[in-house]
Amino acid sequence: NPGKGHGNEYYLPEGYQDPDDCLAMARRAKDKGMQIEFTFAYSDTWSDGENQLIPYDWRPYIEGNNLTGDELATYLEGKIYEFTKDMMLKLIEQGTCPEYVSIGNEMQYGLLYNNHKKNNGFYNKSGYLTRFVNAGARAVRETSPESKIVLHSDHGGELLSRRKAFIN
């Protein structure tokens, strides 16, 4: 979780699943001899198929520059890449490189679209989803080529129902 904004009723309290907490959890897991599957949710709140809220700390630039459409997508693509790369480097530096990395959490038909009923134009737009997932994947591959990249669909048992979301 990149920042600390309030998005919905499921708000993560200060210090819970923030970067420092995630690094500490990774250290505990490795100390116990466990493999790590690290999920990048890119949200201050629980992200799921209904809600993919843009992190609070990323919003001032968006709002201050009235970003929409491709400009907004380009900005978010850069933030996803930067945040993913930064966290991966921190994990590697402390000796907890994850074996598996999930780009996004419980994705339905998009990533960072806010809410599917009142969205910013990224819901059900496979081109944007592809750009965002590729930005995170590129950061993982550059920092840890041995880590396996996974995607977490909200309908894992019915993956074909989400197939169109990943077709560009």
Spans of model-derived segments:
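Distinct, well-ordered alpha-helical segments
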Residues: 49-50, 157-168
